[in-house]
């Protein structure tokens, strides 16, 4: 996961968050702060319990997808295109 602060010292307004589900998987969602309002965007991406190398590789790929989505939303928020 990316660090809490950007290189210019401001806090990020879009963060990847995780929520543990009852079946043992972990759901990923974005926590978006825009104009003082917090919204959540659930990504429908899930991490598996890391029991094998294949699970670890799968989770790395899913986190990479989530990071790509996060950076796209960050750009949208910064350019004020994101509607809450």
Predicted ranges, named:
Residues 1-84:
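Basic/aromatic DNA-contact patch characteristic of tyrosine site-specific recombinases
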């Amino acid at each position: 996961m990316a660090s809490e602060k950007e290189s210019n010292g401001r806090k990020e307004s879009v963060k990847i968050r995780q929520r543990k589900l009852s079946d043992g998987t972990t759901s990923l969602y974005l926590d978006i702060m825009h104009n003082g309002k917090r919204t959540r965007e659930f990504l429908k991406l899930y991490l598996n319990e890391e029991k094998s190398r294949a699970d670890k590789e799968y989770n790395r790929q899913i986190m990479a997808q989530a990071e790509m989505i996060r950076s796209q939303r960050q750009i949208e928020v910064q350019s004020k295109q994101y509607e809450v």
